[in-house]
Amino acid sequence: TLARQYDGTTAAAGSTLSSFDALQGGETLTLSGSGTAANDNVANGISVSSLGTLALVNGTGAASNYSLNSTVINIAKRVLNSSGSKTYDANTNALAGAITLSNLVSGEALNHSGTATISSANAGSYTISNLSGISIADGSGGAASNYTLTGGTHNFTVNRRPVGVSGTRLYDATTNAVASDLSTHANLVGSETLNLSGTGTIASKDVGSNKTVSVGTLALADGTNGGLAANYTLTGGTHQLTVNQRPLNATLARQYDGTTAAAGSTLS
């Protein structure tokens, strides 16, 4: 009896020997060469319809004392691996659309659907803890009955969610974009909040709208409603600062001249 995983072929190699059924006195033999199975799909007890080059090889017993009679092969389901990723979204779902199957036979594809589960919603790398929600179906050249997800390696990564910061301040003759001026945080999940510290920079100190902020020493910190800085990143976010004109009060001074004139030249 030979045994192997499904590989899309009818190969029945001696190297896949599982057992002999009539060896005497505890003797052992091995098997070399290769024959041809009657079909290539998953099943037990498939007849090796052509012995081909299969041959008995001496073990603790002499091959010359035995002859190779009927031979069968058990073809087991091929174990699939999977991997995937998503951006942090505060849940433990790993949707089929974010998962890629691997270890398929070359030229075969499968469809898959449903939702798996990971052990934590937070950003990080995980082994998928529950695959029961994922099902596989026939695809291009691939039959689902020849494959299984059970026993494979299934990894999933939750990436940090990019967050953007924006705000306004009055002109102050600097290119600083301090955290306290960047009070709007975009792309947070649900009601989660974050805190911000440090100072970024803008390219010009002058008045203008939606100036791009370089991150500099700006840093995220844990906020409220479950907002954890470790689940977010400033990298990839859109960061903008609007610099508004600073209101000025002017004081003029002159001697009485009998008029209501308030000339700029009398600025004090």
Predicted regions and their residues:
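Short loop/turn motifs that initiate or flank beta-strands
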Residues: 1-268
